[in-house]
């Protein structure tokens, strides 16, 4: 079955998933946030086939999520570096990871924990807040399409 493209939907989540919804793509962004920058490092970390990894990296560069720079160590390699647009995905990955650790691991099962570098304490759970600071639940939110 052919996948439906969502690039023209008025739903921001649909458009975002159209771009980054593939799990290899999000794992590449996750690894880039952890400091991985070379093709070989991504491949070693992810175990992705070279053609899949190459296709995903090219797409992330084309969409402005990653940029290609000369290797920081002066070698002939190139580094894939997150752009501002790519770095803006951090809350998405943190929220996804927090959801996964809460719902997809058994009690006592080893699970990666995100901690604050300064004090080594776990991150607080991401919350959705109103303009006035109130924490919002799903029933407190409505999606609208503003008139243009």
Predicted regions and their residues:
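A detector for short, charged/polar N-terminal pre-domain segments
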Residues: 1-7
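Basic, amphipathic "hinge/linker" alpha-helix immediately C-terminal to the N-terminal HTH DNA-binding motif
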Residues: 21, 72-93
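Alpha-helical linker/hinge and terminal dimerization helices associated
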Residues: 16, 26, 63, 92-103
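C-terminal regulatory/oligomerization modules of transcriptional regulators
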Residues: 94, 98-148
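N-terminal helix-turn-helix DNA-binding core of bacterial DNA-binding proteins
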Residues: 11-52
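Canonical helix-turn-helix DNA-binding module
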Residues: 39, 43-71, 75
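Short, charged/polar surface micro-motifs in flexible loops or helix N-caps
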Residues: 34-36, 86-87, 120
